[in-house]
Each structure stands twice: as structure tokens, then as C-alpha cells.
Design a protein with these regions (language model features):
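N-terminal Rossmann-like dinucleotide-binding module
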Residues: 1-57, 180
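Alpha-helical elements of Rossmann-like donor-binding domains used by nucleotide-donor carbohydrate transfer enzymes
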Residues: 27, 31, 53, 68, ...
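Beta-loop-alpha module in the N-terminal Rossmann-like domain of NAD(P)-dependent dehydrogenases
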Residues: 58-122
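Short loop/edge segments at beta-strand edges and connector loops
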Residues: 64, 105, 132-134, 190-193
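A contiguous active-site-proximal alpha/beta segment in oxidoreductase catalytic domains
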Residues: 77, 109-171
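Rossmann-like dinucleotide-binding domain that binds NAD(P)(H)
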Residues: 156-213
Length: 213
């Protein structure tokens, strides 16, 4: 059964990353529009120029507000790709209109534990599946490593060195999630160096992590 999808936010990951790359799939808009199991039915974007770009490329309307989108359609899946500081506000507003089957939220889910837990609780009490866009969990190679860990073709303990850039929340968290997927929950974290700040909300610390396995 084909699932309908709406996008909240038409910035880089929402639409722009692959706009001039016709042979690449780097955005939610391109990914859902080319997948046979989904139908892109609309979007929300405050920037009028981006709304016009969306319509030109995907032949679907983008609206300035959630209310206008949901007057037009009630999609099965809502993709939250707006700035991180708006994630809680947007998801809370979605539930004021209806309960979608699933919400796919860009990472990081939030900048603080309080907001992240509030988002998780909102989805839980409303019976809506919440996914955070840590795409490596769906990568065939990653799944093969996971299977080999389960079958003990790869034996623990295991040591990994990860280099990342553009912030621990926005990019480094991909690898923390990958390590927990492979090795289990985080047991302890030791800060080695605080590193530089990346904007107001992110940084690039060096740290040591032990995982339960």
C-alpha cells in the first residue's frame, strides 16, 4: 500500500541538496518522490521562493503553515526537516490537527534532553511511530556487520576510531547511533577535549565511549 508523505521544511535535506543533481538522491523530496511505496503530497515552507521551487520540481503544492497543509491533506507520514530548535513546536502542532501513522524527524531530534523526551512522549501517548533519520541503520553493509556480530563471526571486544566534523549533534551523532546499533548501549563517556564550538548549540569534542556488549 502506498503511503502519502508531506515534508515540513524545504531547506538542504528537505529539498535543496540534490536540486541540481538529477542523478543523485540526497534529499527527502527526491527520495520519497522516487520510491514506489510512497507518494509525496505536499510540504510546508515559510519561504515563498522555495515553495515555488518545490511545485516546479515535484508538481505538488507547498504551504506556508501546517494548518493550510492539513486542510489539503492528512498524510500518512510527516517528515520534520525544519531547524532543530523548531522540532518540538512543529511536532506538538501536528498533533493538534491529527495523528499521522509515523513521523520521520531529522537529527538531532532536539538540542536538549527535555525537548527530546517531550517529543518522544508526544508520539508515544498518541500512538505514532517516531523515527530519527539515522540512515546508516538501513545500510546493507551496516546490517551485514550487525548480523556478523550476532553470529559471532566478528568477535567482541572491538575498538573503533571515528573522525567527524560539523558538530557532534548534527554529524557525530550518526556514528554514536551506529556504534550503539552494533555494540549496545553506552556504558560510559569520558571527555578528552572540549573542542571548538559550532554555532550556538553544537561543538566538536574529542571523547572516549565504552559500550555495553
Amino acid at each position: 500500500m502506498v503511503k502519502s508523505v508531506a515534508l515540513i521544511g524545504l531547506g538542504g535535506i528537505g529539498m535543496l541538496y540534490d536540486l541540481k543533481l538529477p542523478n543523485s538522491v540526497l534529499s527527502h523530496a527526491r527520495a520519497f518522490s522516487e520510491h514506489n511505496s510512497f507518494k509525496l503530497v505536499g510540504a510546508v515552507e515559510p519561504d515563498e521562493t522555495l515553495r515555488k521551487v518545490f511545485y516546479k520540481n515535484y508538481n505538488e503544492l507547498a504551504y506556508p503553515t501546517l494548518a493550510e497543509l492539513f486542510d489539503h491533506c492528512l498524510p500518512d507520514v510527516v517528515v520534520v526537516a525544519c531547524p532543530t530548535n523548531l522540532h518540538f513546536t512543529v511536532i506538538d502542532e501536528i498533533f493538534r490537527f491529527y495523528n499521522p501513522q509515523a513521523i520521520l524527524c531529522e537529527k538531532p531530534l532536539a538540542y536538549c534532553n527535555e525537548d527530546a523526551e517531550a517529543i518522544n512522549n508526544l508520539c508515544r501517548v498518541n500512538g505514532v511511530k517516531l523515527f530519527v533519520n539515522y540512515i546508516r541503520r538501513a545500510d546493507p553493509g551496516v546490517l551485514e556487520v550487525k548480523n556478523r556480530l550476532i553470529t559471532r563471526d566478528i568477535c567482541l571486544p572491538f575498538k573503533a576510531v571515528v573522525w567527524y566534523s560539523k558538530g557532534v549533534l548534527h554529524n557525530g551523532s550518526h556514528f554514536l547511533d551506529l556504534m550503539t546499533f552494533w555494540f549496545g548501549p553506552v556504558q560510559s563517556i569520558k571527555l578528552i577535549d572540549a573542542g571548538p564550538h559550532i554555532g550556538e548549540e553544537d561543538a566538536e569534542p574529542d571523547f572516549h565511549v565504552d559500550f555495553v556488549h
